[in-house]
Regions:
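N-terminal intrinsically disordered, cationic/polar leader segments
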Residues: 1-112
């Protein structure tokens, strides 16, 4: 488990979900891509034009963020201001951008 308090974890993980939603909203307004974002508590589901999905959800007991896409599932822990994959050390937004680009069929970039 991370060195975060529960309150800090919730604040940081909520910030991630909100940043993703804001990016999707901006893309819709700018007619970049039509991704449907549906948030229920700590789960955010992104539905792409081809009906494929990416799911980002919080895991409060573990202080992790999980990302699931067609390519697989990934677990992230907060360290040094970033969400880092527990297996390969990659950064969350880079992985989300890669997976969204693959499923969206065009370059898409998420930032925190």
């Amino acid at each position: 488990m991370s060195g975060l308090s529960d309150a800090e974890y919730h604040r940081l993980s909520d910030r991630v979900l909100s940043a993703i939603e804001q990016t999707i909203d901006r893309w819709l307004q700018e007619d970049v891509i039509d991704i449907d974002a549906q948030r229920t508590g700590g789960l955010l589901e992104l539905v792409f034009p081809d009906r494929s999905r990416i799911v980002v959800n919080t895991q409060p007991p573990l202080h992790e963020l999980w990302l699931a896409s067609r390519a697989g599932g990934y677990h992230y822990r907060h360290a040094d201001g970033l969400w880092i994959d527990t297996r390969d050390g990659s950064e969350f937004y880079a992985a989300l951008s890669r997976e969204a680009s693959a499923q969206g069929g065009r370059p898409l970039r998420f930032e925190g």
